[in-house]
């Protein structure tokens, strides 16, 4: 990620315009047992913010997308082998489902588009509400205060 940003970002800075979207993960936003993967994705999020600050006045925007559990071929194969329980994965998301690959692509396209011209340094979770849902589960699904 760093090398791609350095090479392509430098060219964009010279042109005075451009947009980069790095792919991170919700794993980089929360502590979890993925002791190599999670810190690497957290580094992508930090790199994104740092480059956005550094290049912000040059016309180059840098953002990230953090997918949640996405129905990729690899995840589907793990589900088919019985290595992953889709019910468990989906139960952790507020929306009760997996993310579809096209949903990640749409988020990337949005951040690259002129519609997002005022957005830089952002990390957009595309997680079907996994961050919200897993937080809710952490606290035992305590119902909200009424009144």
Residue ranges: model-predicted function:
Residues 2-5, 9, 97-131:
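C-terminal substrate-recognition "lid" of short-chain dehydrogenase/reductases
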């Amino acid at each position: 990620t760093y090398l791609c940003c350095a090479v392509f970002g430098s060219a964009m800075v010279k042109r005075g315009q451009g947009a980069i979207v790095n792919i991170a993960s919700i794993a980089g936003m929360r502590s979890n047992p993925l002791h190599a993967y999670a810190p690497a994705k957290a580094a992508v999020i930090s790199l994104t913010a740092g480059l956005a600050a550094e290049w912000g006045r040059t016309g180059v925007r840098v953002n990230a997308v953090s997918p949640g559990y996405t129905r990729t071929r690899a995840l589907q194969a793990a589900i088919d082998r019985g290595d992953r329980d889709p019910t468990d994965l989906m139960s952790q998301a507020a929306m009760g489902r997996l993310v579809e690959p096209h949903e990640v692509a749409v988020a990337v396209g949005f951040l690259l588009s002129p519609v997002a011209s005022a957005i830089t340094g952002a990390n957009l979770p595309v997680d079907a509400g996994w961050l919200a849902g897993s937080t809710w589960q952490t606290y035992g699904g305590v119902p909200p205060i009424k009144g």
